[in-house]
């Protein structure tokens, strides 16, 4: 086959052959195969050129994708699939990028976990799930997590939650709120409970009573639209008890309130 036309199209070159076939190639392909108009290619040369052209194009796509942030092997492969790069070419590109240290799942996991320690609020269980979603294998994640101390981060997160809710909830409800939030963020139950030891949950009776009054008013406005009489009283009691208030305190308030 003879090349009848070579035309630059933005970042690629359009090559047309005398058998009416056309294809896009990278500049690296032009240089490597010394392509020019009227050059004759046999079938083997043409197949080699096509393979290299897609490899070069796919690698350029991958490097562009990696220029924004670190990515996992799977993320790069998925990106290339979206651009219709063939599977065997993707495998070659991933191998090259690994050899050239553009991608490294272990380093990515380590960086992700370290950044969370500095600026994040996630515990090890959630971190592992997020890394697995990126396609990183457990054997690349688990050793790093096992060597990372999450106690200070748990204390930092619990303190932030304490500051946010201490004027809104009684001690028991506040403890439950912080514990549940830490569990949701991926910290272990033991770590969540241990982090509470660094917080001061002491509230005087007047503070608790003020909180109870405020919550009772709130729940009454909500529930009195649907209920009245004994049913309303029951609903108010249940709502306040779930919030962590003492049963005797609730009953005393309800006697004077209704």
UniProtKB/Swiss-Prot annotation:
Xref: Gene3D superfamilies: Winged helix-like DNA-binding domain superfamily/Winged helix DNA-binding domain (1.10.10.10)
Protein purpose: Modulates RecA activity.
Family: Belongs to the RecX family.
Signal peptide region: none
CC annotations in GO: cytoplasm
Gene Ontology biological process: regulation of DNA repair
Presence of the UniProt keyword Cytoplasm in the record: yes
UniProt entry tagged with the keyword Magnesium: no
Pfam family, one: RecX_HTH1
Classification via InterPro entries: RecX_HTH_1st (IPR053926), RecX_HTH_2nd (IPR053924), RecX_HTH_3rd (IPR053925), Regulatory_RecX (IPR003783), WH-like_DNA-bd_sf (IPR036388)
Compartment annotation: Cytoplasm
UniProt-recorded name of the protein: Regulatory protein RecX
Disulfide bridge map: none
Keywords carried by this UniProt record: Cytoplasm
